[in-house]
Amino acid sequence: MSCKTPPTLQELAENSLLKNQDLAISALDDIPSLFFPSLFKKACRNRYVGIIKAMVQAWPFPCLPLGAMISRKTAYRRILEIILYGLDALLSQKVPHSRCKLQVLDLRVMPLKLWNRLPVFGTAGCSENPAVVGHSGTEVKQPVKVLVDLVLKESPLDSTESFLVQWVDNRNGLVSLCCCKLQIWAMSMYYHRKLLEILDLDSVQELRMYCISNPVCLLNFAPYLGRMRNLRCLILSHLWQTFSMTPVEKQQVITQFTSQFLKLKCLQILHLDTVFFLEGHLDELFWWLKTPLETLSVIDCNLSKSDWFHISEFQCTSQLKHLNLKWVKLTHLSPEPLRVLLLKSASTLTSLDLEGCQMMDSQLSAILPALRCCTQLTKFNFHGNYISMPILRELAYNVVKQKSQQSKIRFIPSCSHHSGLEFEAISQPHIVFVDVDRTTGEQEQVLFYAICSGEYVL
Protein backbone atom coordinates (compact mmCIF):
# COMPACT_ATOMS: atom_id res chain seq x y z
CA MET A 1 0.00 0.00 0.00
CA SER A 2 1.45 3.36 -1.02
CA CYS A 3 1.30 6.28 1.37
CA LYS A 4 0.12 9.58 -0.07
CA THR A 5 2.29 12.51 0.92
CA PRO A 6 0.26 14.93 3.03
CA PRO A 7 -0.10 18.48 1.65
CA THR A 8 2.26 21.13 2.94
CA LEU A 9 1.05 24.12 4.93
CA GLN A 10 1.56 26.29 1.85
CA GLU A 11 -0.59 23.98 -0.28
CA LEU A 12 -3.31 23.95 2.37
CA ALA A 13 -3.25 27.75 2.54
CA GLU A 14 -3.41 28.08 -1.26
CA ASN A 15 -6.29 25.62 -1.56
CA SER A 16 -8.18 27.52 1.12
CA LEU A 17 -7.69 30.85 -0.66
CA LEU A 18 -8.83 29.48 -4.00
CA LYS A 19 -12.14 28.39 -2.49
CA ASN A 20 -13.00 32.02 -1.74
CA GLN A 21 -12.26 34.47 -4.55
CA ASP A 22 -12.86 37.62 -2.49
CA LEU A 23 -10.61 36.34 0.29
CA ALA A 24 -7.88 35.40 -2.17
CA ILE A 25 -7.92 38.83 -3.84
CA SER A 26 -7.85 40.70 -0.55
CA ALA A 27 -4.96 38.53 0.68
CA LEU A 28 -2.70 39.44 -2.23
CA ASP A 29 -1.37 42.39 -0.25
CA ASP A 30 -0.06 40.14 2.50
CA ILE A 31 0.85 36.69 1.18
CA PRO A 32 4.59 36.04 0.62
CA SER A 33 5.88 36.59 -2.90
CA LEU A 34 7.06 32.99 -3.00
CA PHE A 35 3.40 31.88 -2.91
CA PHE A 36 2.54 33.71 -6.13
CA PRO A 37 3.89 31.26 -8.77
CA SER A 38 2.22 28.21 -7.26
CA LEU A 39 -1.03 30.03 -6.51
CA PHE A 40 -1.12 31.53 -10.00
CA LYS A 41 -0.59 28.13 -11.64
CA LYS A 42 -3.49 26.65 -9.69
CA ALA A 43 -5.73 29.62 -10.48
CA CYS A 44 -4.99 29.20 -14.21
CA ARG A 45 -5.60 25.46 -14.07
CA ASN A 46 -9.05 26.03 -12.56
CA ARG A 47 -9.88 29.16 -14.63
CA TYR A 48 -10.43 31.45 -11.63
CA VAL A 49 -10.77 34.56 -13.79
CA GLY A 50 -11.08 37.13 -11.01
CA ILE A 51 -8.08 35.80 -9.10
CA ILE A 52 -5.93 35.64 -12.25
CA LYS A 53 -6.70 39.27 -13.14
CA ALA A 54 -5.99 40.45 -9.62
CA MET A 55 -2.71 38.53 -9.41
CA VAL A 56 -1.49 40.05 -12.68
CA GLN A 57 -2.11 43.53 -11.26
CA ALA A 58 -0.19 42.65 -8.07
CA TRP A 59 2.54 40.47 -9.64
CA PRO A 60 5.61 40.91 -7.38
CA PHE A 61 8.24 39.82 -9.95
CA PRO A 62 9.63 41.60 -13.03
CA CYS A 63 8.63 38.74 -15.34
CA LEU A 64 5.51 36.60 -15.78
CA PRO A 65 6.66 33.56 -17.84
CA LEU A 66 3.30 32.43 -19.17
CA GLY A 67 5.02 30.46 -21.95
CA ALA A 68 6.03 27.86 -19.37
CA MET A 69 2.36 27.00 -18.91
CA ILE A 70 1.55 26.36 -22.58
CA SER A 71 0.25 22.81 -22.88
CA ARG A 72 -2.97 22.95 -24.86
CA LYS A 73 -3.55 25.59 -27.53
CA THR A 74 -7.20 26.22 -26.70
CA ALA A 75 -6.59 26.47 -22.96
CA TYR A 76 -3.62 28.77 -23.53
CA ARG A 77 -5.69 31.16 -25.65
CA ARG A 78 -8.27 31.52 -22.89
CA ILE A 79 -5.65 32.06 -20.17
CA LEU A 80 -3.85 34.60 -22.37
CA GLU A 81 -7.05 36.58 -22.86
CA ILE A 82 -7.67 36.67 -19.11
CA ILE A 83 -4.11 37.84 -18.41
CA LEU A 84 -4.26 40.54 -21.07
CA TYR A 85 -7.51 41.82 -19.57
CA GLY A 86 -5.68 41.94 -16.25
CA LEU A 87 -2.88 43.90 -17.92
CA ASP A 88 -5.47 46.30 -19.33
CA ALA A 89 -6.63 47.04 -15.81
CA LEU A 90 -3.02 47.47 -14.68
CA LEU A 91 -2.19 49.84 -17.53
CA SER A 92 -5.26 51.96 -16.84
CA GLN A 93 -4.31 52.50 -13.19
CA LYS A 94 -2.83 55.90 -12.42
CA VAL A 95 -1.37 54.47 -9.22
CA PRO A 96 -0.48 50.78 -9.71
CA HIS A 97 -0.66 48.17 -6.98
CA SER A 98 2.09 48.70 -4.42
CA ARG A 99 3.44 45.18 -4.94
CA CYS A 100 3.40 45.15 -8.72
CA LYS A 101 6.82 44.93 -10.40
CA LEU A 102 5.66 43.44 -13.69
CA GLN A 103 7.75 44.59 -16.67
CA VAL A 104 7.68 41.56 -18.98
CA LEU A 105 5.02 39.07 -20.06
CA ASP A 106 7.07 36.22 -21.50
CA LEU A 107 5.08 34.09 -23.96
CA ARG A 108 8.05 32.11 -25.28
CA VAL A 109 7.55 28.35 -24.98
CA MET A 110 9.67 26.79 -22.23
CA PRO A 111 9.48 23.65 -20.05
CA LEU A 112 6.84 23.75 -17.33
CA LYS A 113 9.43 22.65 -14.76
CA LEU A 114 11.04 26.08 -15.09
CA TRP A 115 7.94 27.61 -13.57
CA ASN A 116 9.08 26.50 -10.12
CA ARG A 117 12.52 28.09 -10.47
CA LEU A 118 12.65 31.65 -9.23
CA PRO A 119 15.28 32.93 -11.74
CA VAL A 120 12.68 32.61 -14.51
CA PHE A 121 10.73 35.40 -12.80
CA GLY A 122 13.76 37.71 -12.87
CA THR A 123 14.68 40.54 -15.20
CA ALA A 124 15.62 38.55 -18.31
CA GLY A 125 14.50 40.49 -21.35
CA CYS A 126 13.58 43.64 -19.47
CA SER A 127 15.27 46.88 -18.58
CA GLU A 128 17.11 47.25 -15.30
CA ASN A 129 15.40 50.63 -14.91
CA PRO A 130 11.63 50.33 -15.32
CA ALA A 131 11.18 54.08 -15.45
CA VAL A 132 13.07 56.93 -17.09
CA VAL A 133 13.05 60.65 -16.39
CA GLY A 134 11.20 62.79 -18.90
CA HIS A 135 11.94 66.38 -19.97
CA SER A 136 9.75 67.74 -17.18
CA GLY A 137 11.76 65.90 -14.52
CA THR A 138 8.97 63.41 -13.78
CA GLU A 139 9.28 59.66 -14.19
CA VAL A 140 7.94 58.24 -17.43
CA LYS A 141 6.74 54.67 -17.13
CA GLN A 142 8.30 52.26 -19.61
CA PRO A 143 5.92 50.11 -21.67
CA VAL A 144 5.28 46.55 -20.57
CA LYS A 145 7.15 44.13 -22.83
CA VAL A 146 5.46 41.10 -24.34
CA LEU A 147 8.10 38.56 -25.41
CA VAL A 148 7.34 36.06 -28.18
CA ASP A 149 9.22 33.81 -30.60
CA LEU A 150 7.60 34.07 -34.02
CA VAL A 151 7.52 31.81 -37.07
CA LEU A 152 6.12 33.56 -40.15
CA LYS A 153 4.92 31.53 -43.13
CA GLU A 154 3.01 32.18 -46.33
CA SER A 155 -0.23 31.65 -44.42
CA PRO A 156 -1.83 34.19 -42.06
CA LEU A 157 -1.08 34.28 -38.34
CA ASP A 158 -3.12 31.88 -36.25
CA SER A 159 -6.02 33.21 -34.20
CA THR A 160 -4.01 33.55 -30.98
CA GLU A 161 -1.18 35.46 -32.68
CA SER A 162 -3.66 37.70 -34.50
CA PHE A 163 -5.46 38.43 -31.24
CA LEU A 164 -2.17 39.33 -29.54
CA VAL A 165 -1.03 41.62 -32.37
CA GLN A 166 -4.38 43.43 -32.41
CA TRP A 167 -4.32 43.79 -28.62
CA VAL A 168 -0.82 45.31 -28.64
CA ASP A 169 -1.75 47.64 -31.50
CA ASN A 170 -4.71 48.97 -29.51
CA ARG A 171 -2.63 49.80 -26.42
CA ASN A 172 -1.25 53.02 -27.96
CA GLY A 173 2.39 52.49 -26.99
CA LEU A 174 1.76 51.22 -23.46
CA VAL A 175 2.85 47.71 -24.53
CA SER A 176 5.87 46.73 -26.61
CA LEU A 177 5.81 43.50 -28.65
CA CYS A 178 9.32 42.00 -28.62
CA CYS A 179 10.74 38.97 -30.40
CA CYS A 180 14.22 37.60 -29.67
CA LYS A 181 14.07 34.83 -32.29
CA LEU A 182 12.26 35.41 -35.58
CA GLN A 183 11.88 32.70 -38.24
CA ILE A 184 10.56 33.41 -41.72
CA TRP A 185 9.52 30.61 -44.06
CA ALA A 186 8.46 31.81 -47.51
CA MET A 187 6.98 34.93 -45.95
CA SER A 188 3.99 36.80 -47.33
CA MET A 189 4.18 40.55 -46.76
CA TYR A 190 0.44 40.71 -47.42
CA TYR A 191 -0.24 38.87 -44.16
CA HIS A 192 2.68 40.05 -42.03
CA ARG A 193 3.28 43.71 -42.81
CA LYS A 194 1.15 44.88 -39.88
CA LEU A 195 3.02 42.60 -37.48
CA LEU A 196 6.39 43.89 -38.68
CA GLU A 197 5.18 47.47 -38.21
CA ILE A 198 4.10 46.77 -34.63
CA LEU A 199 7.04 44.58 -33.63
CA ASP A 200 9.91 46.20 -31.73
CA LEU A 201 12.57 45.28 -34.29
CA ASP A 202 15.35 46.36 -31.93
CA SER A 203 14.49 43.29 -29.85
CA VAL A 204 15.29 40.78 -32.62
CA GLN A 205 18.60 39.06 -31.88
CA GLU A 206 18.31 36.04 -34.17
CA LEU A 207 16.73 36.02 -37.64
CA ARG A 208 16.32 32.91 -39.80
CA MET A 209 15.01 33.21 -43.35
CA TYR A 210 14.24 29.98 -45.22
CA CYS A 211 12.98 29.09 -48.68
CA ILE A 212 12.48 32.55 -50.14
CA SER A 213 11.71 31.97 -53.82
CA ASN A 214 10.29 35.41 -54.59
CA PRO A 215 13.04 38.07 -54.58
CA VAL A 216 10.39 40.77 -54.17
CA CYS A 217 9.98 39.51 -50.60
CA LEU A 218 13.62 40.44 -49.96
CA LEU A 219 13.00 43.86 -51.47
CA ASN A 220 9.95 44.49 -49.27
CA PHE A 221 11.58 43.04 -46.16
CA ALA A 222 14.83 45.02 -46.50
CA PRO A 223 13.70 48.14 -44.55
CA TYR A 224 12.66 45.97 -41.59
CA LEU A 225 16.01 44.16 -41.62
CA GLY A 226 17.80 47.49 -41.38
CA ARG A 227 15.87 48.34 -38.21
CA MET A 228 17.09 45.20 -36.39
CA ARG A 229 19.98 47.08 -34.81
CA ASN A 230 20.65 44.45 -32.13
CA LEU A 231 20.69 41.48 -34.50
CA ARG A 232 23.48 39.06 -33.55
CA CYS A 233 22.73 36.01 -35.70
CA LEU A 234 21.45 35.95 -39.29
CA ILE A 235 20.74 32.72 -41.18
CA LEU A 236 19.79 32.88 -44.87
CA SER A 237 18.94 29.48 -46.31
CA HIS A 238 17.69 28.49 -49.76
CA LEU A 239 17.14 31.82 -51.46
CA TRP A 240 16.39 31.40 -55.15
CA GLN A 241 14.50 32.94 -58.04
CA THR A 242 11.50 31.19 -59.58
CA PHE A 243 10.63 33.76 -62.26
CA SER A 244 12.59 35.85 -64.70
CA MET A 245 13.94 39.29 -63.81
CA THR A 246 15.97 41.71 -65.85
CA PRO A 247 19.54 42.28 -64.64
CA VAL A 248 18.54 45.78 -63.57
CA GLU A 249 15.62 44.49 -61.50
CA LYS A 250 17.75 41.83 -59.86
CA GLN A 251 20.48 44.33 -59.04
CA GLN A 252 17.90 46.65 -57.49
CA VAL A 253 16.69 43.89 -55.16
CA ILE A 254 20.22 42.85 -54.21
CA THR A 255 21.39 46.41 -53.56
CA GLN A 256 18.33 47.26 -51.47
CA PHE A 257 18.72 44.07 -49.40
CA THR A 258 22.50 43.98 -48.92
CA SER A 259 22.79 47.70 -48.13
CA GLN A 260 20.86 47.07 -44.91
CA PHE A 261 23.89 45.16 -43.57
CA LEU A 262 25.60 48.50 -42.95
CA LYS A 263 23.15 49.03 -40.06
CA LEU A 264 23.72 45.60 -38.46
CA LYS A 265 26.51 46.72 -36.17
CA CYS A 266 25.95 43.93 -33.62
CA LEU A 267 26.00 41.04 -36.10
CA GLN A 268 28.36 38.26 -34.98
CA ILE A 269 27.09 35.14 -36.77
CA LEU A 270 26.30 34.94 -40.49
CA HIS A 271 25.15 31.69 -42.15
CA LEU A 272 24.62 31.59 -45.91
CA ASP A 273 23.27 28.21 -47.01
CA THR A 274 22.35 27.57 -50.67
CA VAL A 275 21.74 31.25 -51.40
CA PHE A 276 21.51 30.90 -55.17
CA PHE A 277 19.95 34.33 -55.61
CA LEU A 278 22.98 36.08 -54.10
CA GLU A 279 25.61 34.10 -56.01
CA GLY A 280 27.95 36.47 -57.79
CA HIS A 281 26.91 39.28 -55.44
CA LEU A 282 28.24 38.11 -52.07
CA ASP A 283 31.04 40.66 -52.36
CA GLU A 284 28.38 43.38 -52.16
CA LEU A 285 26.99 41.86 -48.97
CA PHE A 286 30.45 41.68 -47.36
CA TRP A 287 31.28 45.21 -48.49
CA TRP A 288 28.29 46.66 -46.63
CA LEU A 289 29.01 44.66 -43.47
CA LYS A 290 31.54 46.70 -41.47
CA THR A 291 31.45 44.75 -38.20
CA PRO A 292 33.97 41.89 -37.73
CA LEU A 293 32.14 38.55 -37.60
CA GLU A 294 32.84 35.73 -35.15
CA THR A 295 31.23 33.04 -37.31
CA LEU A 296 30.96 32.88 -41.09
CA SER A 297 29.32 29.90 -42.79
CA VAL A 298 29.03 29.73 -46.56
CA ILE A 299 27.51 26.32 -47.32
CA ASP A 300 26.72 24.61 -50.62
CA CYS A 301 27.13 27.76 -52.70
CA ASN A 302 28.60 28.04 -56.20
CA LEU A 303 30.94 30.93 -55.56
CA SER A 304 31.89 33.09 -58.50
CA LYS A 305 35.53 34.08 -58.89
CA SER A 306 34.54 37.58 -57.79
CA ASP A 307 32.86 36.25 -54.63
CA TRP A 308 35.86 34.08 -53.82
CA PHE A 309 38.58 36.66 -54.45
CA HIS A 310 36.81 39.35 -52.44
CA ILE A 311 35.84 37.23 -49.42
CA SER A 312 39.17 37.86 -47.68
CA GLU A 313 39.37 41.58 -48.43
CA PHE A 314 36.72 42.95 -46.12
CA GLN A 315 36.83 43.97 -42.48
CA CYS A 316 34.00 41.61 -41.54
CA THR A 317 36.22 38.55 -42.17
CA SER A 318 39.31 39.79 -40.31
CA GLN A 319 38.70 38.25 -36.85
CA LEU A 320 36.81 35.01 -37.46
CA LYS A 321 36.56 32.39 -34.74
CA HIS A 322 34.61 29.90 -36.85
CA LEU A 323 34.83 29.47 -40.63
CA ASN A 324 32.62 26.97 -42.44
CA LEU A 325 32.90 26.44 -46.21
CA LYS A 326 31.19 23.05 -46.29
CA TRP A 327 30.30 21.78 -49.78
CA VAL A 328 31.70 24.88 -51.50
CA LYS A 329 33.58 23.40 -54.47
CA LEU A 330 37.08 24.88 -54.50
CA THR A 331 38.69 22.53 -57.05
CA HIS A 332 38.94 25.15 -59.79
CA LEU A 333 39.42 28.19 -57.55
CA SER A 334 42.69 29.68 -56.39
CA PRO A 335 43.70 28.82 -52.79
CA GLU A 336 45.08 32.34 -52.31
CA PRO A 337 41.89 33.93 -50.87
CA LEU A 338 41.60 31.10 -48.33
CA ARG A 339 45.28 31.47 -47.42
CA VAL A 340 44.83 35.20 -46.83
CA LEU A 341 41.63 34.59 -44.89
CA LEU A 342 43.38 32.12 -42.57
CA LEU A 343 46.29 34.49 -41.99
CA LYS A 344 43.97 37.39 -41.14
CA SER A 345 42.16 35.27 -38.53
CA ALA A 346 45.21 33.26 -37.40
CA SER A 347 45.08 34.53 -33.82
CA THR A 348 41.32 34.01 -33.39
CA LEU A 349 40.27 31.01 -35.53
CA THR A 350 39.21 28.00 -33.42
CA SER A 351 37.25 25.89 -35.94
CA LEU A 352 37.59 25.35 -39.68
CA ASP A 353 35.23 23.21 -41.77
CA LEU A 354 36.29 22.38 -45.33
CA GLU A 355 34.16 19.27 -45.75
CA GLY A 356 33.26 18.43 -49.32
CA CYS A 357 35.33 21.26 -50.85
CA GLN A 358 37.07 18.77 -53.19
CA MET A 359 40.45 20.39 -52.68
CA MET A 360 43.56 18.92 -54.32
CA ASP A 361 47.14 18.45 -53.09
CA SER A 362 48.37 21.73 -54.54
CA GLN A 363 45.61 23.70 -52.83
CA LEU A 364 46.19 22.17 -49.41
CA SER A 365 49.94 22.68 -49.79
CA ALA A 366 49.29 26.36 -50.51
CA ILE A 367 47.33 26.89 -47.29
CA LEU A 368 49.50 24.72 -44.99
CA PRO A 369 51.78 27.63 -43.95
CA ALA A 370 48.70 29.66 -43.02
CA LEU A 371 47.25 26.72 -41.09
CA ARG A 372 50.45 26.55 -39.05
CA CYS A 373 49.83 30.14 -37.97
CA CYS A 374 46.34 29.32 -36.63
CA THR A 375 47.50 28.71 -33.08
CA GLN A 376 43.98 28.60 -31.60
CA LEU A 377 42.59 26.04 -34.06
CA THR A 378 40.95 23.15 -32.19
CA LYS A 379 38.54 21.72 -34.76
CA PHE A 380 39.30 21.06 -38.41
CA ASN A 381 36.96 19.04 -40.63
CA PHE A 382 38.64 17.99 -43.88
CA HIS A 383 36.32 15.18 -44.93
CA GLY A 384 35.57 15.02 -48.64
CA ASN A 385 38.82 16.21 -50.26
CA TYR A 386 41.19 14.52 -52.76
CA ILE A 387 44.51 14.42 -50.90
CA SER A 388 47.52 12.11 -51.26
CA MET A 389 49.26 10.40 -48.35
CA PRO A 390 52.41 12.57 -48.27
CA ILE A 391 50.29 15.70 -47.90
CA LEU A 392 48.20 14.04 -45.19
CA ARG A 393 51.35 13.19 -43.24
CA GLU A 394 52.58 16.74 -43.54
CA LEU A 395 49.23 18.07 -42.41
CA ALA A 396 49.12 15.80 -39.38
CA TYR A 397 52.70 16.00 -38.17
CA ASN A 398 53.70 19.51 -39.18
CA VAL A 399 50.44 21.26 -38.29
CA VAL A 400 48.93 19.25 -35.45
CA LYS A 401 52.09 18.33 -33.58
CA GLN A 402 53.33 21.89 -33.84
CA LYS A 403 50.37 23.04 -31.76
CA SER A 404 51.42 20.89 -28.84
CA GLN A 405 54.38 18.54 -28.67
CA GLN A 406 52.50 16.68 -25.95
CA SER A 407 49.45 15.95 -28.09
CA LYS A 408 48.26 12.36 -27.95
CA ILE A 409 47.64 11.05 -31.47
CA ARG A 410 45.23 8.14 -31.94
CA PHE A 411 44.78 6.25 -35.21
CA ILE A 412 41.29 4.96 -36.01
CA PRO A 413 40.59 2.70 -39.04
CA SER A 414 38.38 4.46 -41.57
CA CYS A 415 36.94 1.18 -42.94
CA SER A 416 34.58 -1.06 -41.02
CA HIS A 417 35.33 -3.94 -43.40
CA HIS A 418 39.02 -4.86 -43.82
CA SER A 419 38.66 -7.96 -46.02
CA GLY A 420 41.73 -8.59 -48.17
CA LEU A 421 43.83 -5.93 -46.43
CA GLU A 422 46.93 -6.62 -44.40
CA PHE A 423 46.88 -5.37 -40.82
CA GLU A 424 50.29 -3.78 -41.34
CA ALA A 425 48.93 -1.71 -44.21
CA ILE A 426 45.97 -0.52 -42.17
CA SER A 427 48.14 0.48 -39.24
CA GLN A 428 50.43 2.71 -41.30
CA PRO A 429 50.29 6.42 -40.42
CA HIS A 430 48.06 7.43 -43.32
CA ILE A 431 46.00 10.01 -41.48
CA VAL A 432 43.59 12.88 -41.73
CA PHE A 433 43.27 15.56 -39.10
CA VAL A 434 39.61 15.37 -38.08
CA ASP A 435 39.29 16.96 -34.69
CA VAL A 436 41.26 18.30 -31.79
CA ASP A 437 39.54 18.44 -28.40
CA ARG A 438 41.31 20.73 -25.99
CA THR A 439 40.59 20.13 -22.31
CA THR A 440 41.93 22.63 -19.82
CA GLY A 441 44.56 21.12 -17.60
CA GLU A 442 44.56 17.78 -19.43
CA GLN A 443 46.51 16.27 -22.27
CA GLU A 444 45.14 17.15 -25.70
CA GLN A 445 43.64 14.40 -27.79
CA VAL A 446 44.05 14.59 -31.55
CA LEU A 447 41.73 12.30 -33.50
CA PHE A 448 42.63 10.81 -36.88
CA TYR A 449 41.22 8.34 -39.37
CA ALA A 450 43.55 5.80 -40.97
CA ILE A 451 43.43 5.46 -44.76
CA CYS A 452 44.37 2.19 -46.42
CA SER A 453 46.24 3.35 -49.53
CA GLY A 454 46.12 5.60 -52.56
CA GLU A 455 44.01 8.73 -53.03
CA TYR A 456 40.51 8.93 -51.57
CA VAL A 457 37.59 11.23 -51.02
CA LEU A 458 37.91 11.10 -47.26
Curated annotation (Swiss-Prot):
It is found in: Cytoplasm; Cytoplasmic vesicle, Secretory vesicle, Acrosome; Cell projection, Cilium, Flagellum. This is Preferentially expressed antigen in melanoma-like protein 1. Its main location: cytoplasm. One of its GO terms (biological process) is positive regulation of cell population proliferation. Gene3D superfamilies: Ribonuclease Inhibitor. Coiled coil: none annotated. It comes from Mus musculus (Mouse). LRR repeats lie at residues 99-126, 176-200, 201-227, 228-263, 264-289, 290-321, 322-340, 346-373, 374-398. InterPro entries: LRR_dom_sf, PRAME, PRAME_domain. Belongs to the PRAME family. PANTHER family: PREFERENTIALLY EXPRESSED ANTIGEN IN MELANOMA-LIKE PROTEIN 1 (PTHR14224:SF6), SIMILAR TO PREFERENTIALLY EXPRESSED ANTIGEN IN MELANOMA-LIKE 3 (PTHR14224). Specifically expressed in testis (at protein level). May play a role in acrosome development and also in sperm maturation and motility. GO terms for cellular component: acrosomal vesicle; cytoplasm; motile cilium. Keywords: Cell projection, Cilium, Cytoplasm, Cytoplasmic vesicle, Flagellum, Leucine-rich repeat, Repeat. The keyword Zinc does not apply.
